[in-house]
From Swiss-Prot:
SUPFAM superfamilies for the chain: Ribulose-phoshate binding barrel (SSF51366)
Family to which the UniProt record says this protein belongs: Belongs to the OMP decarboxylase family. Type 1 subfamily.
Protein's name in the database: Orotidine 5'-phosphate decarboxylase
EC number: 4.1.1.23
Single GO term (MF): orotidine-5'-phosphate decarboxylase activity
GO biological process, one term: 'de novo' pyrimidine nucleobase biosynthetic process
NCBIfam families, per database record: PRK00230.1, pyrF
Described purpose of this protein according to its UniProt entry: Catalyzes the decarboxylation of orotidine 5'-monophosphate (OMP) to uridine 5'-monophosphate (UMP).
Catalytic reaction equation(s): orotidine 5'-phosphate + H(+) = UMP + CO2
Keyword Glycoprotein: no
């Protein structure tokens, strides 16, 4: 029932960096993958690229030795979400996610769908509050508490459902580790090396700051993918993390 194209979920890759493959075409994405080492990072495939190129892109990245985070943020009725998560497991991805706001029944169904895969199941994480959202954005959709409070509420629900962790802002990391435990994985977008533009992220941190507050995996896109020398930039970020006490 497990995929033959699976790379690994054993933790043999120690890098906390997940590079977002936000490219307009597959050739550009694969050209980038050929410039960096799978020992230095994992790769994230999101909605745009997966919609355009589908499972073939995942297989191409697996053939190059990369672990893949399939970032599709499933949010649907429990049965549909469970089937989608199982389909991701069949692809052999390292990590897959759902929206925590889909509720406990949806998240529990997704978790149960991965049980037959045992140790080969992908990590299943939930999105709390998008890092592009601030308090005003939450008020617009009827949520009157702060992004941090909403993230904590949804993280607790995710933990109760037995998922492996959450996608959250690095600003919530310390509190979420306290609430959900050290083994609860925190995956954070909105990470920008010093001097990088914020782009469309509003709640950002540097890689060093993120590691210091307990982030397990940091998603970094344009600062690496648009670098003239992506591997050099990646290595520089990794080197900076070794200095974090």
């Amino acid at each position: 029932m497990t995929s033959a194209t699976k790379t690994n979920n054993s933790g043999s890759i120690s890098s906390p960096i997940v590079v977002a493959l936000d490219y307009a075409n597959k050739d550009a994405a694969l050209a980038f993958a050929d410039q960096v080492s799978p020992q230095d990072c994992r790769l994230k495939v999101g909605k745009e690229m997966f919609t355009l190129y589908g499972p073939e892109l995942i297989r191409d990245l697996h053939q190059r030795g990369f672990d893949v985070f399939l970032d599709l943020k499933f949010h649907d009725i429990p049965n549909t979400t469970a089937r989608a998560v199982a389909a991701a497991a069949e692809l052999g991805v390292w990590m897959v996610n759902v929206h925590a706001s889909g509720g406990a029944r949806m998240m529990s169904a997704a978790k149960e769908a991965l049980l037959p895969y045992g140790a080969q199941a992908p990590l299943l994480i939930a999105v709390t509050v998008l890092t592009s959202m601030d308090s005003e954005d939450l008020r617009d959709i009827g949520i009157t508490i702060s992004p941090a409070e909403q993230a904590e509420r949804l993280a607790k629900l995710t933990w109760d459902c037995g998922l492996d962790g959450v996608v959250c802002s690095a600003h919530e990391a310390v509190r979420l580790k306290q609430v959900c435990g050290e083994d609860f994985s925190l995956v954070t977008p909105g990470i920008r090396p010093q001097g990088s533009e914020a782009g469309d992220q509003r709640r950002i941190m540097t890689p060093e700051q993120a590691v210091a507050v307990g982030v397990d995996y940091m998603v970094i896109g344009r600062p690496i993918t648009q670098s003239p020398d992506p591997e050099k930039t990646l290595r520089e970020i990794l080197a900076s993390l070794t200095k974090v006490a």
